[in-house]
């Protein structure tokens, strides 16, 4: 019959060609949906997350250390007070020293409290993003914002530490060509508290500067 003779061969060809065309279509669709989408998604993630996981953990650690040092500076200065007696021209006079008697020390307390609050806020935000496995710095605008904040507070801590250092140095050395003595001899505990507070103040400044440098590196690597 013609069905058995002539029509059978074209049917076989169709049966053979259909799977080949289907395999080719599968290969094309796999190429379009697989490597291309994966490559673009990875590029976006890399652009949004220029830092690795370790760098983000280091960013959070810097915030935590800044909180500790700024709170320590605040605590030591806030507890700096002492009463004693001092000899001037042979007269024993009672003296009392307290951090609130100096505007420089009050300024250091205020700046340290502001830095502690700023660092705590940034730590909470960074920790929440880190636990959700999201980028700690989500965008360039956020990076610029925290960079500006870190710069402002770092300069404020420098000025507070410098002002407090001047007053402390005057207390330790006295005033030349006058009878004013070294006030830190009878007020040793007070001066020690102030010195430790100033040390933690400059340490906080260094940590803020390190955070700012990390944010500059992030801005230089990010594209979005």
From Swiss-Prot:
InterPro entries membership: CASP/CASPL, CASP_dom
Membrane topology: Multi-pass membrane protein
A Gene Ontology term for the protein's cellular component: plasma membrane
Glycosylation-annotated residues: 171
Main location: membrane
Subcellular location: Cell membrane
Stored Pfam families: CASP_dom (PF04535)
Alphabetized UniProt keyword annotations: Cell membrane, Glycoprotein, Membrane, Transmembrane, Transmembrane helix
Cytoplasmic side: 1-59, 128-142, 214-224
Extracellular side: 81-106, 164-192
Family that this chain belongs to: Belongs to the Casparian strip membrane proteins (CASP) family.
Subunit field text: Homodimer and heterodimers.
NCBIfam families: A_tha_TIGR01569 (TIGR01569)
This protein's name: CASP-like protein 3A1
